[in-house]
């Protein structure tokens, strides 16, 4: 049974600001093999969710350079996983963070922005780490930055992925036993 727990936005932002200008040794650096931006965005979302989906090909996980899901490092695959694109949702069981497309005004700290170039390719993932009035501030790797104004980037379009929550799996039998014994409701997130 899947239940939804809140996304910890403040943790995603704290992680982004701590690691944007250096590489966390727990993760490979993809800067020389296509870019590190979505790897970094995934790390930030992981900091706010602490759940991975280990489904081969259609999940969202990182174990090592050689053992990771395409959605961990690929801009389009990340989008497909987070927005539960039909090709992903039907194959990965739904565990993990999930997002919806929102306007720039509705985007919040800890959300992810993806940029499209003039030729139509989505090429960059950034994490929203601040707002100054109407200005969105982002942190990212591959051109490492902290709190850079989004308006200073040159891009044709942007999409804003609002992380709605995190789906986790709860064992139905365990749920029943806890409820029967009068314990805490296991379908409710424990903070």
Language model region names:
Residues 54-57, 125, 150:
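Short, solvent-exposed loop/turn and secondary-structure capping segments
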Residues 1-76:
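N-terminal capping segments
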Residues 62-138:
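...with weaker cross-activation on analogous glycine-rich loops/strands in unrelated enzymes
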Residues 137-142, 150-191:
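Low-complexity, Gly/Ser/Thr/Pro-rich intrinsically disordered linker/tail segments
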């Amino acid at each position: 049974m899947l239940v939804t727990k809140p996304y910890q936005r403040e943790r995603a932002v704290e992680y982004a600001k701590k690691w944007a200008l250096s590489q966390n040794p727990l993760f490979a650096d993809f800067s020389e093999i296509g870019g590190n931006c979505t790897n970094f965005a995934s790390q930030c979302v992981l900091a706010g969710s602490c759940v991975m989906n280990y489904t081969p090909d259609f999940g969202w996980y990182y174990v090592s350079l050689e053992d990771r899901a395409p959605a961990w490092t690929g801009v389009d695959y990340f989008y497909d996983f987070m927005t539960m694109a039909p090709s992903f949702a039907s194959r990965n069981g739904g565990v993990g963070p999930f997002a919806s497309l929102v306007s720039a005004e509705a985007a919040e700290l800890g959300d992810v922005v993806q940029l499209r170039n003039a030729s139509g390719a989505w090429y960059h993932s950034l994490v929203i780490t601040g707002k100054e009035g109407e200005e969105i501030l982002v942190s990212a790797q591959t051109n490492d930055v902290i709190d850079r104004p989004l308006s200073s980037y040159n891009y044709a379009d942007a999409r804003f992925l609002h992380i709605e929550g995190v789906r986790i799996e709860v064992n139905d039998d365990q749920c029943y036993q806890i409820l029967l014994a009068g314990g805490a409701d296991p379908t409710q997130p424990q903070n």
